Amino acid sequence: MRLLLNSILLIFSMTAAAACLWGVSHLAWYYALPALFGFMLINNMPFAILHEAVHGVAARTAAGNRAIGIIAAWAFPTSFTLQRRAHLNHHKNNRTDKELYDYYLPDQPRWLRNIWMYGGNLLGLYYFCVLLGNLLWFIAPGVYRSRVFVTKIAPALGFGSQVPELAKLPPLTIWSELLGAFLWQALLFWALDLSAAGYLICLWAFALHWSALQYADHAWSRRDVMNGAWNLKVLPVSRWLALNYHCHLAHHQHPQAPWYELPSLVDDQPRPTFWRVYFTMWRYGVRPAPQMGAAADLDFLFPPEK
């Protein structure tokens, strides 16, 4: 039943995303704009299903999880195996010095960390860095796994805690999964007769939303591996299209719970809106890091009335 539900949602979302891609490339601007907005939102659903598969809860069998995870990854596009390793590393490193994008440490230049936050999380470059990394692995896996890339280039781009682990994954598995993902994107481009401009602007719109969401659900939260996240308040339609991804604290506390159980696991901790966190990131940039274990900065997020 779980696999059937997620398969139906995956088919629906990938079909809707394809329709939005077509609309942006072929319709007048007053129809293309809603299609662009639709793609920005609906393309989060395949990613949410990929996220379920990464945790082994998209289906009740390992084979079912792997199959739906590989197909869901086509929409990003990425490799299921790459994403699984990267995301499980995130659960291990969350809010530690290895994975801290809203704060900067004493030995880190603030200007560089602001580039990572503004460029990566708020302007969508985080998504494109992942995409370019996937392309590099596909074209030149030896370069991706090289000492220079792992120890010099990846850390300079903010991926120093991830790439060393990713470079150890089986190359043929990653390459074959990326081949499927890139072929799917090429098929969409050809079959829907997409324009390059329309396709790229859709990717950028999705990048803006996806990149911001990846850290808005953590910024200024408790410096704690398991409890360092928020259950963000969003419109019901946004939460549904992302399959309750905004219930992120509940997910970190219960990573084996499927998406439809997360709302019942939301605790009584303060719940900022997505926009409250998002605009504080824009307004203030990175801030000096508190010690590991420090509580969420509620006075910063919810300033007292004067």
Outline where the language-model segments fall.
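Non-catalytic, topology-defining segments of multipass membrane proteins
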Residues: M1-L41, W74-A196, Q256-K306
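Transmembrane alpha-helical segments that form the membrane-embedded catalytic/substrate-channel core
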Residues: M40-A53, S79-Q83, S195, Y199-D224, ...
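His-Asp-centered metal-binding catalytic motifs of divalent-metal-dependent phosphohydrolases/nucleases
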Residues: L50-G56, H87, H251
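Active-site His/Glu-centered metal-binding helix of metallohydrolases
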Residues: A53-V54, N93, W220, Q253
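Active-site-flanking alpha-helical
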Residues: V54, A58-A59, V225, H254, ...
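Juxtamembrane helix-capping/reentrant segments at transmembrane boundaries
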Residues: A58-T78, E99-M117, V225-R239
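Cytosolic juxtamembrane regulatory segments of multi-pass membrane proteins
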Residues: F159-S161, L232-C247
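C-terminal transmembrane module of eukaryotic multi-pass membrane proteins
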Residues: H246-L249, P255
